[in-house]
Amino acid sequence: MILFPNCKINIGLNITSKRADGYHNLATVFYPINWCDAVELIPLPNNNSLSASVHFTQSGLSIPGKEADNICLKAYLLLKNNFPGIPPVNMHLHKTIPTGAGLGGGSANGAFTLLLINKKFNLNLPAEQLSAYALKLGSDCPFFIINKPCYATGRGEQTEPLPLDLSAYSFLIVHPGIH
């Protein structure tokens, strides 16, 4: 099974204060756009020869850091720890959304991995519960469970859906590659 995690833009990003925990409070509009990565999940038989419960591969744009820190792996392990019946899997991420660009590509990948596992293995978790798991992965991850225009506050984890349709407009996104 494959899903295509889209990214988002922030409209009117306003940093309202610095928090004691090192994060910033913000007020912004998260708007999903159709620029996507791809996450594929293939279940393996429980008697597979892999020692790990997940075999992860990646293509496309490179992702800095250790593979073990990839948010897709973290999402799989988060659910696997709570639902031990989830079988071992082959997981592949094809990355087209640049990292560190403020587009939420990594957050989308984590949230969509939760959605993918929920659907593929019939966990039947409601959106509220998936959002709670997503928040453990990152502040803006719950947005991608909803994946509709939202007014976001706090660290980005507090969202309120907005009736905003910008489909009649075109966007030019420039990534200067400075991150």
Q: Where are the model-predicted features located?
A:
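N-terminal, positively charged, Ser/Thr/Ala/Gly-biased leader segments
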Residues: M1-H55, S59
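Short pre-catalytic strand/loop immediately N-terminal to key active-site residues, enriched for Gly-Thr
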Residues: V89-G102
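Globin-like tetrapyrrole-binding proteins
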Residues: C72
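DPxDG-like acidic metal-binding loop motif
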Residues: A101-A127, F143
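A short coil-to-beta-strand element that immediately follows conserved catalytic motifs
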Residues: I11, I86-M91
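Short, basic phosphate-binding NTP loop
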Residues: A75-F83
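ATP-dependent small-molecule kinase catalytic core of the GHMP/sugar-kinase superfamily
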Residues: I2-P5, G12-T28, N122-H179
